[in-house]
Design a protein with these regions (language model features):
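Phosphate/diphosphate-binding glycine-rich loops and adjacent basic-rich segments that engage nucleotide
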Residues: 225-236, 240-243, 252
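Short strand-connecting beta-turns/loops that link adjacent beta-strands
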Residues: 20-23, 81, 181, 235-236
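Short, acidic/polar N-cap/turn motifs at the starts of alpha helices
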Residues: 1-5, 217, 228
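N- or domain-start disorder-to-order transition segments that initiate the globular core
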Residues: 1-24
Length: 409
C-alpha cells in the first residue's frame, strides 16, 4: 500500500513504516539540502554542518549528545549527499522518545560553538586526505566534477581545505536558517510502538510553530559534452570510469535503466561485466556499474581497476558488452530472468528496516509519498525487451560515453 505522509502545521512531513518483528526502532530526519545548495567558495558546507551539528545544542554539550544514544546501545549517525542531509538513530524501542527528542534538539537548537567547529575542520581535512588515498572512490568525484563543469552537482561533497577555511560561523548560521526548517524536512520512522504513538511524539517535539518556507532547488541547464581525460595520480594500477548522463529521478524511463544496470554490472556475481571480464579472464578484481539519479539528470557509470598492461583489453571487453546490449534485444527468457533476480534482490533488501526508513524519507522529500512494493513490482514487470534495447542505445552508445582515467605520475 502506498504510504502518504502526515504533515504538521509547520510543514514537517511525518512518514511511518510499519513493522512488528523486533524491538528496534529506527528514526531518520531527512533534510532537503546538500552540496548543490552551496556557494562555490563555501563548498563542503552541507557536510561540514553534518559534522558540527553534534557539537552542542542549547541544552547539551558534545559529550552529552554522543552519549545520549550510545549509552543505551544505540547508534546515532548522519550522512550528506549532493541533494540531501540525513541524521538517523537506531535504538531499542524503549528509547524511541529519547531518539525523537534528540533529533528535534539537533534540528532546532544546535549552537555551533566557535571553538568546536574550528576544531572539526581539521577532522574533515583528514577525511579529505583519506578520500584522496582511495582512488576507487575519488575518481567518481573527479568524473562528476568534469562532466558537470560549472553546474552545482559537480561540487565535491567534502569540499577542499581552501573552501573549508573560507567558512565562518556566521556562514553556517545563515545556511542553517535558510535550509534547516520544518517544511524542508521529513521525519520517517519504523517502530513497534505503532503509528499513532510515533505521530504524537513527532507533534510533541517537532510541532514548533515555524512557518518559514524554503526556495526549491534552482534547476540549472546542464551543458552536456563528452570528455576523454587522463589525470596523473600516484597509483599502482589503472582506474577508469566510463559514463554518460542518464534519466533524472522522476523520469518514467528510469526503471528500465535500473534493471539494465543491474543486469550489466549490478551487485550479483552473475552480472555480465563480472562474468565476462573478471570471471572469464581474471583481468580485474573490481568492476561494476552504477546509476545515480538527481533532480534534473542522472549519471550512469562503469568503474574498473586493473593492471596497466590489461587496461586496453579490459576496455575492449566492456565496450563489447555494451555493444551487445545496444544491438541485440533480450530474449523473453533473459528478460524474465533479469526481472526475477532484481525483484528478488529488492525483496531481500526489505529485511533492512533502516534502509527502508531512509529510503522513505528521501521518497517523501522528492515525490510526496512512498510507493507500495506491489506498485514497484508492477513497474518492473511492465518493462519490455524493446524498452531495454531503446534505453541501452540512449545511454550505452560508445560515441556518447565519457571516460576518465587515473594514470601513473
Amino acid at each position: 500500500m502506498e504510504i502518504l505522509p502526515k504533515i504538521l502545521n509547520n510543514g514537517l512531513r511525518i512518514c511511518y513504516i510499519p513493522q512488528s518483528f523486533n524491538n528496534i526502532c529506527h528514526v531518520a530526519l531527512t533534510i532537503g539540502v546538500g552540496t548543490r545548495n552551496e556557494k562555490k567558495e563555501h563548498n563542503g558546507m552541507a557536510h561540514y554542518i553534518e559534522h558540527t551539528i553534534f557539537k552542542g545544542t542549547k541544552k547539551r554539550k558534545p559529550f552529552h549528545i554522543l552519549s545520549r544514544i550510545d549509552s543505551v546501545g544505540g547508534e546515532l549517525n548522519a550522512f550528506t549527499t549532493k541533494e540531501e542531509t540525513c541524521i538517523y538513530i537506531s535504538v531499542h524501542n524503549d528509547y524511541l522518545e529519547r531518539a525523537v527528542e534528540l533529533l528535534s534538539d539537533l534540528f532546532f537548537n544546535a549552537t555551533f560553538p566557535e571553538k568546536e567547529i574550528i576544531k572539526e575542520k581539521e577532522v574533515i581535512k583528514d577525511e579529505i586526505q583519506m578520500y584522496l588515498d582511495t582512488p576507487s572512490e575519488q575518481i567518481y568525484d573527479d568524473f562528476e566534477e568534469i562532466i558537470f563543469k560549472e553546474h552545482p552537482l559537480g561540487l565535491s561533497i567534502l569540499g577542499s581545505h581552501k573552501t573549508l577555511d573560507n567558512i565562518k560561523r556566521k556562514d553556517v548560521l545563515n545556511f542553517i536558517k535558510e535550509h534547516y526548517i520544518p517544511s524542508n524536512a521529513v521525519l520517517s520512522a519504523s517502530t513497534p510502538s505503532g503509528e499513532i504513538h510515533f505521530n504524537k511524539l513527532a507533534q510533541k517535539y517537532f510541532g514548533k510553530n515555524i512557518t518559514n518556507t524554503v526556495n526549491k532547488n534552482t534547476t540549472y541547464k546542464i551543458n552536456k559534452s563528452i570528455i576523454n581525460k587522463n589525470i596523473n595520480r600516484n597509483v599502482v594500477q589503472a582506474h577508469t570510469v566510463i559514463g554518460n548522463f542518464a534519466f533524472a529521478r522522476n523520469n518514467s524511463k528510469r526503471t528500465s535503466l535500473v534493471l539494465l544496470n543491474n543486469l550489466l554490472g549490478g551487485p550479483g556475481m552473475n552480472s555480465r561485466l563480472n562474468l565476462n571480464i573478471r570471471e572469464k579472464y581474471g583481468f580485474t578484481y573490481q568492476i561494476d556499474s552504477s546509476y545515480q539519479t538527481y533532480t534534473e539528470t542522472g549519471i550512469f557509470s562503469i568503474y574498473y581497476s586493473t593492471d596497466f598492461s590489461k587496461k586496453e583489453r579490459t576496455e575492449e571487453l566492456i565496450y563489447k558488452e555494451l555493444n551487445i546490449l545496444c544491438k541485440k534485444k533480450l530474449s523473453l527468457n533473459q528478460l524474465n530472468a533479469a526481472k526475477r533476480q532484481f525483484i528478488g534482490q529488492l525483496t531481500l533488501s526489505r529485511e533492512n528496516v533502516l534502509n527502508m526508513v531512509l529510503g522513505a524519507g528521501k521518497s517523501v522529500l522528492y515525490k510526496g509519498h512512498v510507493e507500495s512494493f506491489s506498485d514497484v513490482i508492477k513497474r518492473i514487470d511492465k518493462i519490455s525487451s524493446s524498452e531495454i534495447l531503446e534505453t541501452a542505445n540512449q545511454i550505452f552508445e560508445p560515441k556518447k560515453l565519457s571516460v576518465l582515467n587515473y594514470v601513473k605520475l
